[in-house]
Amino acid sequence: MPLKGEKNRQKSTKQRSKSLQTKKQDRENCPHCATGAETYGYLKRAYVYDVDLARKIVSDGREPVELERDDVAYCVDNSRIHQQHIDHVNPKYPGILGHLWGPGEDGTWEHGHVLIDGNHRAARCLRDGLPFQAYLLSEDESEQILKRGAGRNGQVYDRMSKDD
């Protein structure tokens, strides 16, 4: 005969196991889970960032920064978010912010940031009321991972291969 509370613990463990199995199946069947080389396109792919290289760069031990909720909402609102993908992304992993340069509406050269990795995790954090963190690339690192687009001095990069 199980001890008091043991039956509930066993049931809870079985439920967690089933939930993890379901999430694994969701990931395996998700058309949006990355397979192979990953890039991030911004502004209809006028800018393309090498996400795999960015992940290697930020694995250097740097600390992520917590983004303000309004900034997270801006990133999510300006991304293509697939609702069926949100439930099985893990919000504990930080995203990656890169630098972005380009002409403003008045023709002046502007500088900002773009979330190149973690938009679905950011959406999940917003939905679930969790904080969202991201690693920040330097300007040099951002140009290093820029496969297509304008750099900080107006230099245009086009390092796309036929596989991108």
Residue locations for each model-derived region?
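Cysteine-cluster motifs in flexible loop/terminal segments that predominantly coordinate metals
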Residues: 30
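Short alpha-helix boundary/capping and kink motifs at helix termini
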Residues: 55-116, 126-127, 133
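General secretory precursor processing signal
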Residues: 20, 33-36, 78
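Conserved catalytic or regulatory cores that recognize and/or transform ribose-phosphate-containing ligands
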Residues: 23, 40-46, 57, 62, ...
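Short Lys/Arg-rich cationic patches that frequently serve as NLS/NoLS or arginine-rich RNA/DNA-binding motifs
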Residues: 2-23
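Residues immediately within or flanking Cys/His clusters that coordinate Zn2+
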Residues: 27
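Basic- and aromatic-enriched surface patches that contact anionic nucleotides/nucleic acids
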Residues: 109-164
